[in-house]
Amino acid sequence: MQQQAIVVDAGDPSTFKEPPKSCALTCPVSGCAENGAPYVCPALAAWDSLPHESTCADWDGGAPAVEATKCTATAASGDAVKYAGPDPDDATKVILPDGRRVTPAGSISYFREMDLEGGEAYSLLPVPSSNWILVVDAGYGVHAVLAVDRTKIGTSSDPVASYVKYPAPKTLNSAAVLVGTSTVLVASDDGVVEALDFDATKGTLTEDDAKSIPLPESVDDNNNKANWYVSGLALSPDGSKLVVTSVFDKRLLVLDATQAGWGKQLGSATLPNAPTQQAAFDPNDATGHFVYVTEQGDRKLLEVDVSNAAAPAVTRSWGTDKNPWGIAFLDARWIAVANDFGDTLTLVDRTANSATAVPVDSAVTLHGEEPTALAFDAPSHMLWTTLAGANAVAAWTVDTSQTPPALSPAGRLPTPWWPTGVAVLPDGSVAISNMRGPSSGTDPTQYPIGSGNPDRGPMFGGMQIVAKPSAADLSAGAAAVATNDQVGALAGAPTVTCPHGENDFPLPPTNTQGPSKHIDHVFFIVRENKTFDALLGDFKGANGAPSLTMKASTVDMDKLWLDFRKAGRQFAISDNYYTSAEVSVQGHVWTVFGRSFDFDERAWFLTGYGGRQVYDNPASQPQGIIPTGRPAEGSVFDWMAANHVEYDVYSEGLGLISAPMVNGHNPVHLDVPGGPTQGQIGYPDVERACYEAAHVRVFCDVGNFVYALLPNDHTEGVGMSTPSPEAMVAVNDDATGIFLDAVSHSPIWKSSLVVITEDDPADGGDHVENHRTPVLFVSPWVKHGYVSKQHVDVSSVHKIFAHVFGIPYPNEIVANAALPLDLFTSTPDYTPFTHEPRQWPLSCGVEPSVNLAEGALSASWGDVDDVDEQPGLGDQVWRAMRGLPATAVTPTMQRQMDESARLVRGRVHVNHVK
């Protein structure tokens, strides 16, 4: 097969709209001409030989004269250059991948049970008159319910007395209630309310299938038949009724909770919309006349009359802010609701039938703190909420004698990474659960997403107990939280000095002084799934581990990643850059939104990861797509449009739901090769890059901000009909070089910045921290041959965007991020990047008969375009790159194949309906 010859007319730009077709990723490769001669992109021809639209500037191929430097930036030092992990100067402090510090108040224990890999503590339920706290542990790996002894939190003893496991595809949700003294009911996606027996004398949990309550057939996110996915559970004050709400179903169920009628459906009500989050009875009303439900679809708190269980009905509703979450009853009149994406509390007056919004922090106007769970302590008149995005819990003193109640900020307490639940115990101490624990540490080989092994990529949550905090504790805690989150203010952050008075620095030190005088085009290129050490671990001047590069030798690394590594040596990189994602669905949230959010952290593994296919829409992931999965400030595309920055999107699934035009410029390219979304991992990136090159050099119609995906380096593993990992990486690298060559040989090169990174670190190990990933800065205005040591992350890249264009920050996470000023220089070097065509030969994977083990693993996967839903792919790519294929199916590979089987069944709903 020859590369398709597209006839181009040197006088007709329209002939460049469709790039030549590539056969590089077609199997078998024997008939592909590109196996001997690399792909040729016509848009890379000499500028004066190309036709140009009238939008193109006159250009002679040269560069402006270089003027002497007027401003300089200092190199980062001190706290600003510390790598993720334990702080070497403070044993009580952990540095997260995003640069924030974790300094938990009180006592902390993390749940490191080895057979609960990938756990995330979703919620907590104190057991009355005891020291026990029950925890729902969900996440990527095995789900579980844990019995935790609060007296052992922070000690050398394991606080987990017992637990019950729910392996995939069983799926738990956060809601849990205690019926009587010994029956625990837990929300699930299994078509039942899961039941357990709890012995408070020993702390023993046992599964009790006989008491699990079957639920009626329901629907999934596509409105197909599916198990009921429970969101809210509420037990009436007299213990006679159980209310159940759903993530996808609009019905509210009232079930019999008495021994005589256990589990019988008494009635149902149709709610205005779904999803719901929490259901709760008012403890101030012993009659249990009403149950209250946070309904996120319409942003409401619902009041449902369940006094007649056979005919429950919605009686009232009150408007809230976006994504109402937790509920707390202040007294018989007032209810508080936490609004996650709204960053507000809603105070509901049931007497006056009104609602009042209160900001979580009146001094902050940006989104990102994310109040979720609520707890009200009546004796102290204190209201508490988890601030998931700030790694904190906040407290207010409440005066209900005023209308509305006066909420006076009492302070905050720092927590570990991503708090999820809060409760005030009878002695006034505060219990807090968290999902992401202390970060994940190093990985000497391959990063396994859900490993519970503390030596290999741990991902686990935990529990925190803070003795009854004083006013001074809360004040000090608020100061600590502010310090922990202000990454950009760390000691040793770079600064810009202009000794001659005139500020000509290309990256303005603030975003309020107008746009950059030198950079007006930014290109953000997102590739797939590599750690820093995997691609750059052998780079001179970088903190790398050569033993962890994907290929064993520098010669092979330079040949396979020819253009990326060439650009890394010519321009600037950082060896202290991170994404806080584990997999692609999170990674694209970070690249598109500049932050993560509670919906993302709780839902990413429900889209196929770990064998759970709860969100089953094959066209999209819920994060960044569905209304309840999009933060209030919107995506980077909404941000650019709101600030009148013309932009283009060359393939991305997230954030495109709105993607408004700017000045009539249509940002979405439906005709981009491989499609406008994230799909078609196996479509040759060289076509994508050549298409984009034509828009840069022939049509000259790119916006000031360009977002583009080049996903081939994700690879499709080792299969008999798929390209080898090396072939896909080589084609991806070729495309990277084509793109850089196009930009740097164009009139806009003199004012351009290209940022290239990976969406997540799923392939390869890293000796510093699992989330460390490569980032490359290409521009005349960056220091050439430079390795930055400043700790930065994806939100830092978005902060660069804000400063280049002189626009407001999109959210608080970006506002607080580090700004890598040291990467830039006032003395430009206009030397362009010259693409070197691919040298690595094309090849396809192995026949299963050649390697039964690797063939069996890859054959177990479903659609490889369902990104990252191939258990074991990262491990397999590592083995293939290192020439160490498995000779037999290992226990780990068998678990991965079993997980794949569950995923494939889930896609056709076999495991969705009982």
Q: What are these regions, as identified by a protein language model?
A:
Residues 8-18:
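Ser/Thr/Gly/Pro-rich low-complexity, disordered linker/stalk segments of secreted
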Residues 18-19, 635:
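Intrinsically disordered, low-complexity proline-rich regions
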Residues 9, 149, 238, 256, ...:
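Acidic side chains
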Residues 475-914:
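N-terminal pro-sequences and low-complexity stem/linker regions of secreted or lumenal proteins
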Residues 19-23, 27-31, 36-507:
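Predominantly soluble domains enriched in secretory-pathway, periplasmic, or organellar proteins
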